[in-house]
Amino acid sequence: MELHFNLELVETYKSNSQKARILTEDWVYRQSYCPNCGNNPLNHFENNRPVADFYCNHCSEEFELKSKKGNFSSTINDGAYATMMKRVQADNNPNFFFLTYTKNFEVNNFLVLPKQFVTPKSIIQRKPLAPTARRAGWIGCNIDLSQVPSKGRIFLVQDGQVRDPEKVTKEFKQGLFLRKSSLSSRGWTIEILNCIDKIEGSEFTLEDMYRFESDLKNIFVKNNHIKEKIRQQLQILRDKEIIEFKGRGKYRKL
């Protein structure tokens, strides 16, 4: 995988935003692959399609590209807040590609956020545009990656290093079971994964998980059986080989 952009494509362009779009989309087309099946190359959707930018003609996964110059951050600008919330709740989102590049026009981070990991909690409403703005009153949103567990942030390129495509596809497929869950059930699994991420080291206990009871109660205020849900979700993650049960209330992250 070559990390440099093809700068010859934008020699006649003056708009920085146009340059960025052309360079990043060209790079994804030439260098990326489908993280679900490994197929290469991905295909472009027609221009100005409102939802996705790329699709895989082998497995039909769709991807929307977001890119920025500079360091990777946990907050990603997206489109209209109301539209995004409808898409998440209707389960008709594409997957997201997030790409960052250096001042030398070289990719330093490129990750995929599988669509099933995007929940209403990870969508942050922005302030309405000022009355003097061209689109006065328009309300956009950000995707908050800090609300997404590590299992939902799959790097193809991380800190300038290309990751093994086989590991990428394995990690992508590992989370596909969530697509069969309801939005509510999926939210529970994602929050349990977030709790596991907060525990240092590769091993943890059931008691470690019970310490998140009050945090989970604040999220799922109508649920009065938090500990039971914790055990249920740990069983699901065991069955999906995301964690390993070592006996006597002990677990290991896989």
UniProtKB/Swiss-Prot annotation:
Pfam family, one: DpnI_C
InterPro entries according to UniProt: DRP, DRP_C, DRP_PD-(D/E)XK_dom, WH-like_DNA-bd_sf
Any GO molecular function: type II site-specific deoxyribonuclease activity
Superkingdom of this protein's organism: Bacteria
CDD domains assigned: DpnI-like
Keyword Protein biosynthesis included in the entry's annotation: no
Catalytic activity as recorded in UniProt: Endonucleolytic cleavage of DNA to give specific double-stranded fragments with terminal 5'-phosphates
Record EC number: 3.1.21.4
This protein's UniProt keywords: Endonuclease, Hydrolase, Nuclease, Restriction system
GO terms classed as biological process: DNA restriction-modification system
Record-stated family: Belongs to the DpnI type II restriction endonuclease family.
Protein name (Swiss-Prot/TrEMBL): Type II methyl-directed restriction enzyme DpnI
Annotated organism of origin: Streptococcus pneumoniae serotype 4 (strain ATCC BAA-334 / TIGR4)
Gene responsible for this protein: dpnC
